[in-house]
């Protein structure tokens, strides 16, 4: 690959904040991070809103200790961005989702859960004490926790905010989501039970997907125990994807459903050898891209664990996705789901 800007591999890793040890451990990383090295620092800085509100389970990587202290993932994305031409604004405030506010950004990134139209204030959780001042246990011996002081508020975006956000993507705003971004705004009648994994269907037989799920391209069903699994890069040309080809590492892998027929699959979940009934299915999309009218959409189910965020490969894929959704690089995202994962739908499970 040509090095048009004159930035060598080691220099770019330094720019990304990735040290020499990572360079040694990841000899295949160059193409992932040099997918369009000339875009780093070239032209106007792209503005990205990183939204990490949790209306459901809040993951540790996006948990703040206080309102003003950024979480682990927020710190990393901000740092990667500042060194690569992206100005990242982090927020958990859904009330900001107005047309005027969203117009300030080139792209929006989600690490979210649940119904984001609702408020979801966060409290410090403390052990519940008995009359003697000792922590109480449940019948399984686990310490019972209760709400303590309010740490910060997470206002909902409301129906108007959700509509403004979806319109922004439709009209050309870039969008990407990590991990539980697929555990957000579920379709009507969303089931977690393994026996009810077919598409959500209304009484008249028509699919009733939430418009957010339609935009994203699929939704979360359930996950099993964290375990190693293999990914396959079915589009190694997507910036950062080749580094994950045949990679095996531990993560909280999502079992997904309701895949859009126009997905351009980038990485597939290789299910052979995985433990748990939710994974006894044929390979299915794990990372993908698609177009929502004028908007570029990217999703990866990775990102539960801190050590995954710490991987230089994950930084490379994230930056590659940011460059694509903000129009800095052009990638062929012709739909390929039928060719690369023909039995991805849950009804085709083993």
What spans do the regions from the language model cover?
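Extracellular ligand-binding/catalytic regions of CAZymes and related secreted enzymes
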Residues: 41-45, 52, 72-73, 83-86, ...
